[in-house]
Structure formats: structure tokens, C-alpha cells
Amino acid sequence: EIGSGLVGSEMCIRDSGPEIAVYAGDYLFIAVFRLMSEHSLELSNLTKNIGSIERLLGGELGQLNHHFNLQQTLDDYIENISGKTGELFALSASVAPLISKNNTLTKRAYKIGMNIGISFQIMDDYLDYASTAQTLGKPVLEDIKQGIYSAPVLFALQENNALVSELIKNEKFDEVYDFIKTSDALEKTKALAKSYTLSALNLIDKLPKGKNRELIAEITRKLLERTL
């Protein structure tokens, strides 16, 4: 996080500099690999977990590769957030059934987590433009200033590519923000998030009936309505 305005949060990059922040992140990944090797009962499970982390990093690198790219498509965006956020949720959701050797449940849980993660990230990007800095606890427009064009920006570009591109190139970010707020970009972004939430809920409905299924469904629905 290069942005320095997160409220009430200590940040490694701000307190110790970018080099230590990067090395600290690398160290944490090594620690994760070590813990997985100690607790994974089968090599296949360890391989799947490492594959998820590989895809997670690939999503982050994909996003970096599209910095300041006004030709980025929604498909590019979905591919990147599927790695950087969707994969994290998918891995978290599928670890328990993976250990229990329930292949059918593992695959379903993975898909549920992926859809929830994608919806979560889209909503995060939606709130960057639909909320205020005070509500979010962090500066708005931080991503677009860093060349990260999320769903609201991409929908705005679809609506008026010439105008929005020109505003971005001239760093008139407040005007981009105003355009997004008055266009259909936010409505389309929310609809996109909802589509992934509904996909997750359809898969959740196929889980064994009971209190746990209802709880998972309730949490999934609430994520779509969050304001933070």
C-alpha cells in the first residue's frame, strides 16, 4: 500500500520504507511455505496450495503489468482480481474439504470462494468511488493516481472513452471522479459484483442443508451490501 492515508493503521512501507516492506512480504511467503510443508499430509495438497499462491502472485503482477494502461479491458480486470483476491478466498474456502479428501466439496468450495472473492474486490473498487475518505478510512482516488483502473473507471471509459482518457492523461482525477458519480459506471459495477455474488449463492445452495449453509449464504449476501 503506497497510499499513506489509511486511518488508524500502521504501515510497514510508511514506517520502514519500500525495501523492508517488500522483503517482509517475501519473508511471510516463505513462512507460509514452511508451515504448509509441516502440516500438509499429502504432497498433492501442498502442490495445490502452492499453485494457489502462484496464481495469487500472478494476479498482482498482472495488475502491475496493466498500470496506466487505458486499453485494459474488463476481461483483463476480472483475470487480475481472480488471481489477487479471488484465489485468496478460493484457497481459504477449499482448504478444509481438501484435507478431508472430499473432492466434490473441495471443487465446489473453491468455486464459491472464487466468486465471493471476485465480488468482494469489485465492491471494494466500487466503494472507492461511491464512498468518502472519511467513510472508507483511506484516501479516495488513490488507485487511479497510481495507474490502477478498476471497474468503475473501465465502465466510465466504455461510456465516453475520449473524454475519460483525456481527463486521466491530464491528471484531472476529480473530474474523472465526478464523471463516474454521474454516469452509469457505479451502477454497472454494483451489477457486476452482484452477478458474482449470485453465482456464489447458487453454488452455496448445493451444499448440505443446515445452519452452516445458511450462515455462509448470509455472510455472502452481506458482503454485497457493505459500506466499508
Functional labels for PLM-detected ranges:
Residues 127-147, 163, 167:
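A beta-strand-loop signature enriched in Asp, Gly, Thr, and Trp
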